Amino acid sequence: MPMDLRDNKQSQKKWKNRTLTSSLEFALTGIFTAFKEERNMKKHAVSALLAVIAGLVFKVSVIEWLFLLLSIFLVITFEIVNSAIENVVDLASDYHFSMLAKNAKDMAAGAVLVISGFAALTGLIIFVPKIWFLLFH
């Protein structure tokens, strides 16, 4: 029996966020789920906390804060997207090995690695001169 387009639209409406509050609630649930279930998110959170503490201790400039916070939020965002991609791939592949599934997961993890490299480089550029000055002056 062919599916009626109206039935499909009605079922889509049931799941569509109707208010800003419900959209925000779903988004926050996703963020909390990522922190609760993903081991790497906890590591990123600890790294972010240490970077913020270092920024406060070394009294970084406004521009340095912008780059520091950009790095932190980019890493967390990419990790959430990576986790979402991994979940969708696992769902679609029903946990069976597929080279396409592996490639998708590897590429998503690679994106996190690239942005983490950017964050590490940003941290080095900001903090190494300050630590150097502290140690040798």
Curated annotation (Swiss-Prot):
CDD domains: UDPK_IM_like (cd14265)
EC number: 2.7.1.66
Pfam families: DAGK_prokar
Deletion consequences: Cells lacking this gene display defective growth at low pH, elevated temperatures, and high osmolarity. Moreover, they exhibit a significant reduction in the transcription level of mutA and a defect in production of the lantibiotic mutacin II. They also show reduced resistance to bacitracin.
Catalytic reactions of this protein: di-trans,octa-cis-undecaprenol + ATP = di-trans,octa-cis-undecaprenyl phosphate + ADP + H(+)
Principal EC category: transferase
Domain of life of the organism encoding this protein: Bacteria
Protein name as annotated: Undecaprenol kinase
Source organism (scientific name): Streptococcus mutans serotype c (strain ATCC 700610 / UA159)
Gene of this entry: dgkA
